[in-house]
Structures are given as structure tokens and as C-alpha cells.
């Protein structure tokens, strides 16, 4: 018993050193004052959802979510909750009813988990020169995840590998035609630990200085550059192989960052125009756009600004200013919690687009403008348009989400790709500048709500999920069968498309 007691005291001491908050058991019996606080917190949460959750009004109107019944159930559960554990469950059930993967309410990480994470990632200070690449990248938050195919295309007869990590690719040799396949397992740079290690070793070869915050940012950008360049080189290999059809496997890809936008543009010879994004009428959106307006004003004040850019920046400034004006016009949708109708729209969706202010700009087109990445976010990546020029098929499933949906919708809605498989997850847009969080101290939870809604060129909200052009009725556990069906669908459709296309006259 003494050994157990000593171990417990040691853990408490370690947690204190780690700065952990005091641990309060969730199963202590609730007092009346606790239940009152929980019910008041519920009202705060509902008000916050109505003001700061971008898909709130859309979900109520599209999914016919009964907010009156939802509130009644949560309030009743909190009024009788025996302890904080039960109260947390009531909050979680209310939030889960919106079925939005980006909307969640969570308790803080357990102190033991935070302690373990700190042990793995270190204190968070500068990383000393000479640190091994693996240790440095773990400290920076990178992980070495598998980048194998989501569906086993590499097990199909006739498969010839051409590339492995970070983008596995190969050719399926067929009787009628060869089909190229490539895997994108993630659009999050932090999931490419091996690429980070390459970047770290390259840095170590030329610098003997510790890696501080600015160094970490530069390393992250280097990882992005390496990924975009590697993807382009892999596409060039596939193009040279003679395969006129490419299948892109994004099954199980839960999303990531703007990397999705850059890679999509390398896959299409067609200029891809971005769709609108809906912003919440909230100080969070206004703060972000005020920063944009300030940048544009500063750039327009340049005496050396090229004439060809001044009209573009004037137009961009006018669009931002008008969007700010609309965001400042209030729209209270909290009456929806009472079952009442509202006539205004929660979002402003006719100003900004998913790439910023401009729906399209060519690579290098704005290179002499400091604000270029603000005007068109993909310009922060050194991508090349149209590296691959053949027929394109994107294979997705119900686990394809978030940035993966941006990737697929961008290609599909511009007529550059055919979607194959299942309806995607329907996660849509996530967070800009961290999103809008709400602390719920009485239950020690934090709500995180998406602050943007990504629309498609058709006007649909990506939260509805993307429907495939070629839906496949496949057995959930039959992964090999899924791969065969996807290839067969792509091959059949590609042949039919070529047969119906007018032949070029011979010279």
C-alpha cells in the first residue's frame, strides 16, 4: 500500500510540475447550484451556436432539426443530472445532433495525457542543433503516418509501381488501356513526418543554430514546397507512361490544409475557379477582414505599384469593404431555438471565396505583390498548373472529408474530374484563424464551432456531402472489390468519353 501511495504522490507531483489543473472527479454528486449553472451554460451555448456556428441556420432549414425538442431534452437532462459526467453527456448529445464533424464540445485533455504529450514533444522551446530528425519533427507536431493506398489498387493484376511515399502511384496495365493510379492519404502537412525529416536534415546541413519559432515556420513551408514538388514529379512520371486516365484515391482522407487546393491545380489543365465561402456576421469575421483591408490599403499606397495591379487591388479593396459592410449588418437567428422563423441570413456569402478574395490567379501572376497570398491563398504554394492532362477520376468514400471535399469539389465543379464511389462525409469548411471557441466552465468543456461555410459553384453547401457522378454499390468490407469496381468504372467511362469525342483531323 505504501508503494501505491508513493506512486500516486509522485504522479500528483509530476502533474503539478507540468502545470496541470486540479483534478475534480466527474462523478461527485451534483448540488442544486450545479444544475442551475449547467442550465444557464446551456443558454450560453445555444446563443453562441446561433451567432458563431456557420452551419447553424443551414442545418436547421435543410435537415429540419427540431431545436425546440433538442433544447427541451438537454434542459431536462441537466435539471436532473446526478453529476458532472451526466451533464457533459447532455451537452455532447445536443452538439452531436447537428452531425457536423467540425463542431464539437470537449472536456480538457486528461492531465496524464498532457503530461505524456509534453514528454514526447518536449518543453516547446527552441530545438537544439544536432537533434535527430525524428525527434525534431515530433517536437514540431509531425507524425509518420502510412501513405499506402486507401483501396488496394496495388494488389490488382497488372499493377506496376512507379512511386511510393509520400504519394504512392503506379500503372495498371490493361488489355484495352493502361490506367494510372495515385494516392493522396492526407492534405495535412503534419502527417508527412518523413518529408519533415528530409527538410530537417537539409536545414542541419547548412545551419548550426537552434530552431526557434520562425525556423519552425520556415521548416513547415519547406515541407509544403517539397510535397507540392514531389506530387508534380510523380504526375510527370505518370504522364510519360502514356496512361491517358488517372484515378486519384482520396478514400479515408480526412482533410488537412490549403495543400488540397494546390495539388488540385497540378491535376488540371483547366483553370480552376474557386467557389464562394459564407462568413458569419460576427466580430471574428470582421477582425479577419479588417486585417485584409489594412493590407490592401497599404499596398495601394505604394508609389511603385505597377499600373496593371492597381485596378485589381482597387476592385479587391472594394469587395472587402462591401463584405465588411454586410457583416456589420446584424442577423439574429436565435429565434430558431424557439421554433420561430427568421427572414435574414446568418451568413454573408457573396463577397469572399474559398481562396480569399480572387476566385482565380495564375501561378506567378501576382509575384510582385506582397499581398498575393491574401488575394489568392494557393499562391503561397509553388505549384504548377496542369502537370497532368489526361482524364481524371477521383475515388472517394464516406470518410473523405473537409479539405478533401474542397479538392474534389474544385475539380468536379470546374469540369476537370469525375467523382466515383460514395457520398463524401459532409464536413465542409472548418475554421479560419482558429475558429470561435466558447468556454463552458461549469462543466469544464470547450465548444469549437466552424466559422465558415464553403459553398460549391452550384451554390450548395459542402456540408451536404459530395455526391459521386458514378455511385458504386460496394460491400463495406470488400476492399479489393471496391478497387476493382472503381477501376472498371473509370476505364468504361473514359473509353465511352473518348469514343463520343470528335476525332482530331490528321495532318
Where are each of the predicted segments found?
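Flexible, low-complexity junctional segments that flank or bridge functional domains
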Residues: 13-343, 359-361, 366-371, 388-394, ...
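Glycine-/acidic-rich phosphate or pyrophosphate-binding loops and their flanking alpha/beta elements
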Residues: 371-387
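Ligand/substrate-recognition segments at binding pockets and active sites
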Residues: 401
